[in-house]
């Protein structure tokens, strides 16, 4: 599993996160929260991650510039690490 500091270090060194071609990602609003569906798993997230989920679900590749607002957010970093761990996101060189 990837840790927060490893994620930040890799992205700051120019690594690119890409969606696994077989990953299925979608999200829905639930009151003020968000429900993320990722490769057969679901997770309830706070509403402030709405734009991050839009980026993750819509983009094939995520640059550090696209992720910067959420890299300083504990929940945002944790989500990215979990999506890498489950194989929905991966580094482009893998």
PLM features per residue range, with description:
Residues 70-85:
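Short amphipathic alpha-helical interaction segments
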Residues 52-71:
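Short acidic, hydrophobic short linear motifs in intrinsically disordered regions
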Residues 1-57, 81, 92-94:
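Acidic, low-complexity/disordered tracts enriched in E/D and polar residues
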Residues 47-51, 65, 74, 78:
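Generic alpha-helical secondary structure signal
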């Amino acid at each position: 599993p990837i840790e927060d500091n490893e994620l930040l270090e890799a992205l700051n060194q120019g690594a690119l996160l890409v969606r696994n071609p077989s990953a299925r990602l979608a999200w829905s609003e639930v009151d003020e929260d968000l429900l993320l569906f990722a490769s057969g798993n679901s997770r309830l997230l706070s509403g402030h991650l709405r734009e991050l989920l839009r980026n993750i679900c819509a983009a094939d590749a995520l640059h550090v510039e696209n992720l910067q607002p959420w890299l300083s957010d504990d929940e945002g970093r944790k989500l990215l690490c979990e999506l890498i761990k489950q194989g929905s996101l991966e580094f482009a060189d893998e």
